[in-house]
């Protein structure tokens, strides 16, 4: 499973002009299930996202996670957006191949599982809409952008 994390001051996602998800300071997480992924990869990716220390402490060092933005237990937002294009293979030719992305039904099942698990352990979760044509608006903080990948099975 692949995740692309962006530390944001704020972010929102729109579908057909309607805001379907919005957060203040936190993480925008673009996620993609790959062929062979299961709940195990989703669990590992979520655990890594929530614990990754990419928010600054008082000294300006990246020592805080989205679960503790201020050192006092204040959680940041987590905006989760599905994006199968993260599985693109661009090695040959000029048109990317997406054969490594999970089939739509499996991708949606794992996305829904990932979101449900996130909501079970994190108080501020917003989402996009699976397979929708979305417009994602964000204000990068830093910028800090990190790719994560948990290898399939």
From Swiss-Prot:
Its EC number is 3.1.1.96. HAMAP family: Deacylase_Dtd (MF_00518). An aminoacyl-tRNA editing enzyme that deacylates mischarged D-aminoacyl-tRNAs. Also deacylates mischarged glycyl-tRNA(Ala), protecting cells against glycine mischarging by AlaRS. Acts via tRNA-based rather than protein-based catalysis; rejects L-amino acids rather than detecting D-amino acids in the active site. By recycling D-aminoacyl-tRNA to D-amino acids and free tRNA molecules, this enzyme counteracts the toxicity associated with the formation of D-aminoacyl-tRNA entities in vivo and helps enforce protein L-homochirality. It is an enzyme of class 3 (hydrolase). PANTHER family: D-AMINOACYL-TRNA DEACYLASE 1, D-TYROSYL-TRNA TYR DEACYLASE. Its main location: cytoplasm. It is found in: Cytoplasm. Belongs to the DTD family. SUPFAM superfamilies: DTD-like. This is D-aminoacyl-tRNA deacylase. InterPro entries: Daa-tRNA_deacyls_DTD, DTD-like_sf. It comes from Acidovorax ebreus (strain TPSY). GO terms for biological process: D-amino acid catabolic process. Homodimer. It catalyses: glycyl-tRNA(Ala) + H2O = tRNA(Ala) + glycine + H(+); a D-aminoacyl-tRNA + H2O = a tRNA + a D-alpha-amino acid + H(+). A motif (Gly-cisPro motif, important for rejection of L-amino acids) lies at residues 142-143. GO terms for molecular function: D-tyrosyl-tRNA(Tyr) deacylase activity; Gly-tRNA(Ala) deacylase activity; Ser(Gly)-tRNA(Ala) hydrolase activity; tRNA binding. One of its GO terms (cellular component) is cytoplasm. A Gly-cisPro motif from one monomer fits into the active site of the other monomer to allow specific chiral rejection of L-amino acids. The keyword Ribosomal protein does not apply. The gene is dtd. Gene3D superfamilies: D-tyrosyl-tRNA(Tyr) deacylase (3.50.80.10). Keywords: Cytoplasm, Hydrolase, RNA-binding, tRNA-binding.
